[in-house]
Amino acid sequence: LVFEALGNHLVAEPLLGALLVGRALTEAGTDAQKAQLEGIIAGTLLAALAHDEPASHYELNRVATTARKDGAGWVLNGAKAVVLFGDQAQLLLVSARTSGAVGDEAGISLFLVPGDAAGVSARGYGRIDGGHAAELTLSNVKVGADALLGAEGAGHALLERVVGFGLLALSAESLGAMDKAK
């Protein structure tokens, strides 16, 4: 109902990121990670899913961004494309490959990365619908072990579920826009 109403009024707000990241936290987060849900729900913590890449062609398993273990944490390198509100997000849910080849379903891990982390750079731009997106570059971004969301290498299944919820929300938004256009 919320996304249908947003579509009915053509509201370009960062709620999709809140839905996607919130759902992922709810399903796979530790208690400490889930504590961020309060800020997402209150609207004081802007969250974004940073998954699509320049050559991914909407295939969830095509992840070239890498995460390698570094002491007690991880170092992320790669590029993310069309990250909704990515240059404004305070929390990024980043997919990265911890093992396997670029097209493998296994080996994708999910990381919670502060939007202002050292090594994260963003080029933001407006979208035709009035929304905002960004191209992100992750260059030697260091995060702690507690940034890993869920099990290492098992992020694909969670991505499928979360993106499925997002597609339902976008369908409702489209329905609202079409209803308004009648």
Feature names for model-found ranges:
Residues 65-68:
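A structural signal for short hydrophobic beta-strand segments in well-ordered beta-sheet cores
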Residues 2, 30, 78, 94, ...:
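Residue-level signal for inorganic ion chemistry
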Residues 77-121:
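A short core secondary-structure module
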Residues 15, 55-58, 82-85, 125-132:
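Short Gly/Pro-enriched turn/cap motifs at secondary-structure boundaries
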Residues 21, 45, 59-63, 87-90, ...:
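A generic structural signal for well-ordered coil/turn residues at beta-strand boundaries
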